Regions:
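Pre-Walker A adenine-sensing motif
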Residues: 1-5
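Short loop/turn elements that form and flank the Walker-type P-loop nucleotide-binding site
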Residues: 6-7, 35, 70-73, 101-105
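Walker A/P-loop nucleotide-binding motif
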Residues: 7-25
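Residue-level preference for the first positions of well-ordered beta-strands
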Residues: 8-12, 38-39, 75, 107-109
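Short glycine-rich substrate-engagement loop in P-loop NTPases that contacts/grips substrate
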Residues: 33-72
Length: 165
């Protein structure tokens, strides 16, 4: 829970289904909320659906208003990244969101059961930048698609192998 005490960077929690990624992310969010940090936790496909509703003339909030809210919340927890349908619009919105938060140095927690190879390159580079992101591999998950994740350049650049849950 050290991350929750002072969330400043990004945390990527990766693992197969059923390993506790969402539960851990929710615990981080609840702790941060309890100490007064503004938190938004949303499942990636639900976020995209929520944003699409902003285009409806019957919605009281515009797309821009909804997107700004997600982009600027102090701590964003994006659950199950990679489970959304990959469309050009969805890919672009997710990149815009992550890129904005990356450039603004806003703390972000992302959970995924996708491996690096299945992610769009520009999203992957934001999630795995060793300058701002730490990775927690749940249950020996092989995020990099290699036999030993500690041999990747990401692990070496942080000076330690990825943490395992």
């Amino acid at each position: 829970m050290k991350y929750a005490e002072d969330p400043k960077e990004w945390l990527l929690i990766a693992g197969v289904t059923g390993r506790g990624k969402t539960r851990l992310a929710a615990a981080i969010g609840n702790y941060c909320r309890d100490i007064g940090i503004a938190v938004m936790m949303v499942v990636a496909p639900d976020l995209l659906d929520w944003l699409r509703v902003g285009f409806s003339p019957h919605n009281p909030r515009s797309f821009d208003e909804l997107f700004e809210r997600v982009k600027n919340v102090h701590l964003l927890i994006l659950d199950d990244l990679g489970s959304q349908s990959s469309t050009p619009w969805a890919d672009e919105k997710l990149f815009q969101l992550l890129n904005y938060r990356y450039n603004a140095s806003l703390p972000t927690v992302v959970t995924t059961n996708a491996n690096a190879a299945s992610m769009e390159a520009r999203v992957r580079t934001r999630l795995t930048d060793p300058q701002i992101s730490s990775m927690l591999l749940m249950g020996g998950f092989d995020f990099w698609g290699k036999a030993d994740p500690a041999t990747t350049s990401f692990a070496r650049s942080r000076g330690r192998p990825p943490r395992r849950g």
